[in-house]
Amino acid sequence: MPDAWDKFGKTVEVSGEGMVLTKTSGGNYSRHAAAKELLSSGVHSWEVELTSGATQNNNRDMFIGVAAPGCDVEKGDHHDKGKAWYLRTHDGNVYGGDIDCEDAAKKGKFFLVGDRVGLRLDCNDGSLRFYKNGEPFGEQFPPGTISMPVVRAVELKCNGQSVTLFPEVQLA
């Protein structure tokens, strides 16, 4: 069976045979969720589709990437603690690994409902590349940035936000 969302807190629900993750309650605070498969060697590619924005205002501000196993699912911002490496859909920047990107213009316009964030993790060199709808996108985490092992991870912020995991996708 392919990987699925496995670790999540009380404000999040999983459906669709473990592939759909939705923040259903709580305030507008990031909450971590992770998939089950431990990624420690080889090259892995997958996509996360933005299934829905926030119920109140369609906000799609979320983090998508990888994290060290065991991060607290009732908290967020694990990239600030050196435990996660994410693309933030709100500004298109990467967060984690001491990478400091310039503040982006047009916040909130980078990813819309239905868009897919592709990820290609090379565990052998510790790099992570991002894609938008199958095309290379934005900054990357260069070789040596990411410490293995990791798990697929997201942080959802607002009630109603939902993502769908597609764990086996080919990305160049």
Predicted features, each with a name:
Residues 1-172:
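PRY/SPRY (B30.2) beta-sandwich protein-interaction domains
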